[in-house]
Amino acid sequence: MDTRMRPSALGFVAVFAALSAFAVPATAQDLTGTLKKVKDTGSISLGHRESSLPFSYYDDNQKVVGYAYELCDKLADAVQAELKMDKLERKLVAVTSANRIPLLTSGGIDLECGSTTNNLERQKEVSFTLTHYVTATRFVSKKANNYKSLDDLKGKTIVSTAGTSNIKLVTGLNTERNLGMTIIPAKDHADAFLMVETDRAAAFAMDDILIASLVAVSKTPDAYVISEEALSVEPYGSMLRKDDPAFKKVIDDAMLAMFKDGTIEKLYDKWFMNPIPPKNVTLNVPISAQFKKVIANPTDSGDPKDYAD
Protein backbone atom coordinates (compact mmCIF):
# COMPACT_ATOMS: atom_id res chain seq x y z
CA MET A 1 0.00 0.00 0.00
CA ASP A 2 1.21 3.49 -0.86
CA THR A 3 1.19 5.42 2.44
CA ARG A 4 2.49 8.66 0.98
CA MET A 5 0.12 11.66 1.27
CA ARG A 6 -0.81 13.74 -1.71
CA PRO A 7 0.26 17.43 -1.53
CA SER A 8 -3.36 18.50 -1.02
CA ALA A 9 -3.70 16.14 1.93
CA LEU A 10 -0.46 17.41 3.45
CA GLY A 11 -1.76 20.96 3.12
CA PHE A 12 -4.97 20.07 4.91
CA VAL A 13 -3.04 18.44 7.77
CA ALA A 14 -0.84 21.51 8.14
CA VAL A 15 -3.82 23.87 8.25
CA PHE A 16 -5.67 21.63 10.72
CA ALA A 17 -2.63 21.48 12.98
CA ALA A 18 -2.27 25.24 12.90
CA LEU A 19 -5.93 25.79 13.77
CA SER A 20 -5.74 23.21 16.54
CA ALA A 21 -2.87 25.09 18.13
CA PHE A 22 -5.20 28.05 18.62
CA ALA A 23 -8.12 25.93 19.79
CA VAL A 24 -6.30 24.00 22.53
CA PRO A 25 -6.51 25.74 25.93
CA ALA A 26 -3.34 26.88 27.62
CA THR A 27 -1.49 24.17 29.54
CA ALA A 28 0.59 24.55 32.67
CA GLN A 29 3.65 24.86 30.41
CA ASP A 30 2.13 27.94 28.75
CA LEU A 31 1.41 29.70 32.04
CA THR A 32 3.69 32.31 33.55
CA GLY A 33 4.00 34.32 36.74
CA THR A 34 1.43 33.91 39.49
CA LEU A 35 -0.92 31.73 37.42
CA LYS A 36 1.88 29.21 36.89
CA LYS A 37 2.81 29.32 40.59
CA VAL A 38 -0.80 28.70 41.59
CA LYS A 39 -1.23 25.88 39.07
CA ASP A 40 2.03 24.20 40.06
CA THR A 41 1.43 24.38 43.82
CA GLY A 42 -2.33 23.89 43.87
CA SER A 43 -2.64 26.84 46.22
CA ILE A 44 -2.90 30.62 46.34
CA SER A 45 -1.44 32.62 49.23
CA LEU A 46 -3.72 35.40 50.45
CA GLY A 47 -2.22 38.11 52.65
CA HIS A 48 -4.69 39.31 55.28
CA ARG A 49 -4.67 41.82 58.12
CA GLU A 50 -5.33 41.11 61.80
CA SER A 51 -7.28 44.23 62.80
CA SER A 52 -8.28 46.22 59.69
CA LEU A 53 -11.98 46.13 60.44
CA PRO A 54 -14.18 45.86 58.36
CA PHE A 55 -11.80 45.01 55.52
CA SER A 56 -9.66 42.16 56.79
CA TYR A 57 -9.44 41.02 60.40
CA TYR A 58 -9.89 38.20 62.90
CA ASP A 59 -13.29 37.59 64.42
CA ASP A 60 -13.79 36.16 67.94
CA ASN A 61 -12.92 32.69 66.67
CA GLN A 62 -9.67 33.83 65.02
CA LYS A 63 -11.27 33.33 61.62
CA VAL A 64 -10.29 35.80 58.90
CA VAL A 65 -13.29 37.86 57.77
CA GLY A 66 -14.01 41.20 56.15
CA TYR A 67 -15.03 43.03 53.00
CA ALA A 68 -11.62 42.90 51.28
CA TYR A 69 -10.97 39.33 52.38
CA GLU A 70 -14.33 38.10 51.06
CA LEU A 71 -13.65 39.93 47.81
CA CYS A 72 -10.26 38.20 47.55
CA ASP A 73 -11.87 34.83 48.19
CA LYS A 74 -14.16 35.43 45.20
CA LEU A 75 -11.13 36.45 43.13
CA ALA A 76 -9.46 33.18 44.10
CA ASP A 77 -12.57 31.39 42.78
CA ALA A 78 -12.04 33.19 39.46
CA VAL A 79 -8.40 32.07 39.34
CA GLN A 80 -9.47 28.49 40.05
CA ALA A 81 -12.02 28.63 37.22
CA GLU A 82 -9.50 30.15 34.81
CA LEU A 83 -7.01 27.37 35.55
CA LYS A 84 -9.74 24.69 35.41
CA MET A 85 -8.70 23.31 38.80
CA ASP A 86 -11.00 20.99 40.77
CA LYS A 87 -9.87 22.61 44.01
CA LEU A 88 -7.63 25.45 45.08
CA GLU A 89 -6.17 25.69 48.56
CA ARG A 90 -6.21 29.13 50.18
CA LYS A 91 -3.09 29.68 52.28
CA LEU A 92 -3.74 32.54 54.68
CA VAL A 93 -0.76 34.70 55.64
CA ALA A 94 -1.07 37.48 58.24
CA VAL A 95 0.62 40.68 57.04
CA THR A 96 1.26 44.13 58.49
CA SER A 97 1.47 47.54 56.88
CA ALA A 98 5.26 47.30 57.10
CA ASN A 99 5.80 43.84 55.58
CA ARG A 100 2.96 43.45 53.05
CA ILE A 101 4.93 44.73 50.04
CA PRO A 102 8.11 42.70 50.77
CA LEU A 103 6.01 39.57 51.27
CA LEU A 104 4.25 40.14 47.95
CA THR A 105 7.36 40.87 45.90
CA SER A 106 9.25 37.91 47.41
CA GLY A 107 6.44 35.46 46.65
CA GLY A 108 5.33 35.00 50.25
CA ILE A 109 1.81 36.04 49.23
CA ASP A 110 0.12 36.14 45.82
CA LEU A 111 -2.71 38.58 46.52
CA GLU A 112 -2.97 41.06 49.37
CA CYS A 113 -6.40 41.39 50.96
CA GLY A 114 -6.40 44.34 53.31
CA SER A 115 -6.81 48.10 53.44
CA THR A 116 -4.01 49.30 51.20
CA THR A 117 -3.98 52.68 49.50
CA ASN A 118 -3.22 52.60 45.80
CA ASN A 119 -0.81 55.45 45.13
CA LEU A 120 1.72 56.34 42.46
CA GLU A 121 4.69 55.63 44.73
CA ARG A 122 3.57 52.08 45.50
CA GLN A 123 2.82 51.45 41.82
CA LYS A 124 6.58 51.59 41.25
CA GLU A 125 6.86 48.32 43.21
CA VAL A 126 3.51 46.55 42.82
CA SER A 127 0.31 46.49 40.79
CA PHE A 128 -3.21 46.98 42.11
CA THR A 129 -6.61 45.54 41.38
CA LEU A 130 -9.43 47.84 40.42
CA THR A 131 -10.30 50.17 43.30
CA HIS A 132 -12.74 48.60 45.78
CA TYR A 133 -13.13 51.47 48.27
CA VAL A 134 -12.38 55.19 48.56
CA THR A 135 -11.57 56.78 51.91
CA ALA A 136 -9.73 59.83 53.32
CA THR A 137 -7.05 60.42 55.96
CA ARG A 138 -8.42 62.01 59.13
CA PHE A 139 -7.54 61.76 62.81
CA VAL A 140 -9.40 60.52 65.86
CA SER A 141 -9.00 62.02 69.31
CA LYS A 142 -10.85 62.20 72.60
CA LYS A 143 -13.86 64.48 72.35
CA ALA A 144 -13.02 66.16 75.66
CA ASN A 145 -9.78 67.56 74.22
CA ASN A 146 -11.63 69.48 71.48
CA TYR A 147 -9.03 68.98 68.72
CA LYS A 148 -10.67 70.16 65.49
CA SER A 149 -7.79 70.37 63.03
CA LEU A 150 -4.22 69.20 62.62
CA ASP A 151 -3.04 72.65 63.71
CA ASP A 152 -4.70 72.04 67.10
CA LEU A 153 -2.26 69.17 67.62
CA LYS A 154 0.80 71.40 67.51
CA GLY A 155 3.44 70.07 69.91
CA LYS A 156 1.37 66.97 70.71
CA THR A 157 2.17 63.28 70.30
CA ILE A 158 0.49 61.71 67.27
CA VAL A 159 0.38 58.03 66.39
CA SER A 160 -0.09 56.35 63.02
CA THR A 161 0.54 52.85 61.73
CA ALA A 162 4.04 51.99 60.52
CA GLY A 163 4.41 51.44 56.78
CA THR A 164 1.25 53.34 55.80
CA SER A 165 0.80 56.26 53.45
CA ASN A 166 -0.88 58.04 56.37
CA ILE A 167 2.21 58.22 58.57
CA LYS A 168 4.22 59.53 55.65
CA LEU A 169 1.55 62.15 54.95
CA VAL A 170 1.37 63.34 58.55
CA THR A 171 5.16 63.46 58.81
CA GLY A 172 5.27 65.68 55.73
CA LEU A 173 2.52 67.98 57.01
CA ASN A 174 4.28 68.21 60.37
CA THR A 175 7.35 69.58 58.62
CA GLU A 176 5.46 71.82 56.17
CA ARG A 177 3.35 73.46 58.87
CA ASN A 178 6.11 73.50 61.48
CA LEU A 179 3.81 71.83 64.01
CA GLY A 180 6.48 70.23 66.16
CA MET A 181 4.43 67.07 66.67
CA THR A 182 6.02 63.85 67.91
CA ILE A 183 4.93 61.11 65.52
CA ILE A 184 5.02 57.53 66.77
CA PRO A 185 4.71 54.47 64.47
CA ALA A 186 2.48 51.68 65.80
CA LYS A 187 2.59 48.04 64.75
CA ASP A 188 -1.05 47.96 63.66
CA HIS A 189 -4.25 49.97 63.80
CA ALA A 190 -5.49 48.41 67.03
CA ASP A 191 -2.25 49.27 68.82
CA ALA A 192 -2.40 52.84 67.50
CA PHE A 193 -5.96 53.36 68.72
CA LEU A 194 -5.02 51.91 72.11
CA MET A 195 -2.43 54.68 72.48
CA VAL A 196 -5.18 57.30 72.17
CA GLU A 197 -7.45 55.27 74.44
CA THR A 198 -4.76 55.21 77.16
CA ASP A 199 -3.71 58.86 76.64
CA ARG A 200 -0.25 57.98 75.34
CA ALA A 201 -1.09 59.88 72.15
CA ALA A 202 -3.36 62.86 71.53
CA ALA A 203 -4.59 61.57 68.18
CA PHE A 204 -4.39 58.70 65.71
CA ALA A 205 -4.13 59.63 62.02
CA MET A 206 -5.46 56.99 59.65
CA ASP A 207 -8.08 56.30 56.98
CA ASP A 208 -11.43 57.49 58.29
CA ILE A 209 -13.25 54.19 57.77
CA LEU A 210 -10.64 52.30 59.79
CA ILE A 211 -10.75 54.67 62.74
CA ALA A 212 -14.55 54.81 62.56
CA SER A 213 -14.60 51.02 62.84
CA LEU A 214 -12.25 51.05 65.83
CA VAL A 215 -14.35 53.71 67.55
CA ALA A 216 -17.53 51.72 66.90
CA VAL A 217 -16.21 48.61 68.67
CA SER A 218 -14.45 50.49 71.50
CA LYS A 219 -15.64 50.48 75.11
CA THR A 220 -16.84 54.11 74.95
CA PRO A 221 -17.58 55.17 71.35
CA ASP A 222 -19.09 58.48 72.47
CA ALA A 223 -15.77 59.53 74.00
CA TYR A 224 -14.11 59.97 70.58
CA VAL A 225 -14.44 62.31 67.65
CA ILE A 226 -13.11 62.03 64.09
CA SER A 227 -11.84 65.22 62.49
CA GLU A 228 -13.90 66.88 59.79
CA GLU A 229 -10.66 67.99 58.18
CA ALA A 230 -9.63 65.48 55.50
CA LEU A 231 -5.88 65.37 54.92
CA SER A 232 -5.94 63.27 51.71
CA VAL A 233 -8.02 60.98 49.47
CA GLU A 234 -7.12 57.28 49.72
CA PRO A 235 -8.33 54.79 47.06
CA TYR A 236 -8.05 51.16 48.20
CA GLY A 237 -7.06 48.23 46.03
CA SER A 238 -5.62 44.76 46.59
CA MET A 239 -1.97 44.43 45.68
CA LEU A 240 -0.58 41.91 43.22
CA ARG A 241 2.87 41.49 41.73
CA LYS A 242 4.02 44.00 39.17
CA ASP A 243 4.57 42.99 35.52
CA ASP A 244 2.22 40.00 35.69
CA PRO A 245 -0.40 40.96 33.06
CA ALA A 246 -1.98 37.50 32.73
CA PHE A 247 -2.80 37.28 36.43
CA LYS A 248 -3.96 40.89 36.59
CA LYS A 249 -6.31 40.31 33.64
CA VAL A 250 -7.99 37.38 35.40
CA ILE A 251 -8.40 39.46 38.56
CA ASP A 252 -9.60 42.60 36.76
CA ASP A 253 -12.07 40.66 34.60
CA ALA A 254 -13.53 39.03 37.71
CA MET A 255 -13.90 42.40 39.44
CA LEU A 256 -15.49 43.96 36.38
CA ALA A 257 -18.07 41.17 36.41
CA MET A 258 -18.80 41.85 40.09
CA PHE A 259 -19.18 45.57 39.41
CA LYS A 260 -21.56 44.79 36.56
CA ASP A 261 -23.79 42.18 38.24
CA GLY A 262 -24.18 43.99 41.57
CA THR A 263 -22.00 41.65 43.64
CA ILE A 264 -19.81 44.51 44.83
CA GLU A 265 -22.82 46.43 46.18
CA LYS A 266 -24.04 43.32 48.01
CA LEU A 267 -20.63 42.85 49.61
CA TYR A 268 -20.52 46.51 50.55
CA ASP A 269 -23.97 46.36 52.12
CA LYS A 270 -23.00 43.28 54.13
CA TRP A 271 -19.89 44.84 55.67
CA PHE A 272 -20.79 48.53 55.97
CA MET A 273 -24.57 48.66 56.44
CA ASN A 274 -25.29 45.55 58.53
CA PRO A 275 -24.10 44.10 61.87
CA ILE A 276 -20.60 42.64 61.62
CA PRO A 277 -18.42 40.60 63.97
CA PRO A 278 -17.06 40.61 66.57
CA LYS A 279 -19.64 42.78 68.39
CA ASN A 280 -22.44 42.89 65.80
CA VAL A 281 -21.94 46.62 65.39
CA THR A 282 -23.37 48.32 62.29
CA LEU A 283 -20.97 50.89 60.85
CA ASN A 284 -23.73 52.52 58.79
CA VAL A 285 -21.39 53.99 56.17
CA PRO A 286 -23.26 54.36 52.84
CA ILE A 287 -21.41 54.10 49.54
CA SER A 288 -19.66 57.42 48.90
CA ALA A 289 -20.04 59.50 45.77
CA GLN A 290 -16.41 58.72 44.91
CA PHE A 291 -16.95 54.96 45.09
CA LYS A 292 -20.20 55.17 43.11
CA LYS A 293 -18.12 56.83 40.41
CA VAL A 294 -15.65 53.92 40.51
CA ILE A 295 -18.43 51.33 40.24
CA ALA A 296 -19.79 53.13 37.17
CA ASN A 297 -16.32 53.60 35.66
CA PRO A 298 -13.88 51.09 37.21
CA THR A 299 -10.26 52.20 37.54
CA ASP A 300 -6.98 51.14 39.12
CA SER A 301 -5.63 54.69 39.16
CA GLY A 302 -3.37 55.72 42.02
CA ASP A 303 -3.91 59.43 41.38
CA PRO A 304 -6.23 61.03 44.00
CA LYS A 305 -7.40 63.55 41.39
CA ASP A 306 -9.22 60.75 39.57
CA TYR A 307 -11.49 60.27 42.59
CA ALA A 308 -12.75 63.83 42.92
CA ASP A 309 -16.51 64.25 43.39
Where are the predicted features?
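Acidic, polar ligand-binding/catalytic clefts
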Residues: 73, 84-152, 292-302
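Bilobed "Venus flytrap"/periplasmic-binding protein-like clamshell domains
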Residues: 45-54, 64-81, 117, 134-189, ...
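Short helix-initiation/N-cap motifs at beta->coil->alpha
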Residues: 31-32, 85-102, 145, 183-195, ...
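Periplasmic-binding protein-like
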Residues: 50, 133-141, 216-252, 274-297, ...
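Ligand-binding clefts/hinges and TM-proximal coupling segments of bilobed small-molecule sensing domains
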Residues: 29, 166-183, 222-223, 256-309
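A ligand-binding cleft/hinge motif common to bilobed small-molecule-binding domains
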Residues: 99, 113-124, 168-176, 194-198, ...
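Extracytoplasmic small-molecule ligand-binding "clamshell" domains
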Residues: 30-32, 37-112, 261
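Extended ligand-binding regions for polar small-molecule ligands
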Residues: 29, 70-78, 151, 156-157, ...
